[in-house]
Amino acid sequence: MGKAYYVKFETPEDLVNPILEAVRVASTSGKVKKGTNEATKAIERGTSKLIVIAEDVEPPEVVAHLPILCEEQGAAFAFVPSKQELGKSLGIDITSAAAAILDAGDAQHIVDQVVSSIAKIKGGKTDQ
């Protein structure tokens, strides 16, 4: 099965672990919002450092608005293959379709690296 229609670009495998690590570290040392609704609010308020969206969300309409909203608001965003892994990185026992890093805490250098890498993947467009 191909990627969901809302996945705007292919996240390289070597970038997935740093993204999940950034979420993991930021959730303990910074501030992270869990879930699609919280991520949406963070984008709209302009408080997100990085939005992380799972690629395996069913139905896809749940998160389909996030990449569009991120592009409109100039927010950095990235995709991870699994909502299960995203949930684990957030330190919760359930899946999470999306997350918003508001304060990276000790993960700031990882977030900066991810945002920079994503900008290059997207063709040099800067999101922040």
From Swiss-Prot:
InterPro entries with a match to the protein in the record: eL8/uL1-like (IPR050257), Ribosomal_eL30-like_sf (IPR029064), Ribosomal_eL8/eL30/eS12/Gad45 (IPR004038), Ribosomal_eL8/Nhp2 (IPR018492), Ribosomal_eL8_arc (IPR022481)
Locations listed in the record: Cytoplasm
Major localization class: cytoplasm
Source taxon at top rank: Archaea
MF (Gene Ontology): ribonuclease P activity; rRNA binding; structural constituent of ribosome
Pfam families, A to Z: Ribosomal_L7Ae
BP terms from Gene Ontology: translation; tRNA 5'-leader removal
Sorted UniProt keywords: Cytoplasm, Ribonucleoprotein, Ribosomal protein, RNA-binding, rRNA-binding, tRNA processing
Ribonucleoprotein found in the keyword field: yes
One GO cellular component, as annotated: ribosome
Protein purpose: Multifunctional RNA-binding protein that recognizes the K-turn motif in ribosomal RNA, the RNA component of RNase P, box H/ACA, box C/D and box C'/D' sRNAs.
Family label: Belongs to the eukaryotic ribosomal protein eL8 family.
Known partners and oligomeric status: Part of the 50S ribosomal subunit. Probably part of the RNase P complex.
Protein name according to UniProt: Large ribosomal subunit protein eL8
Name of the gene: rpl7ae
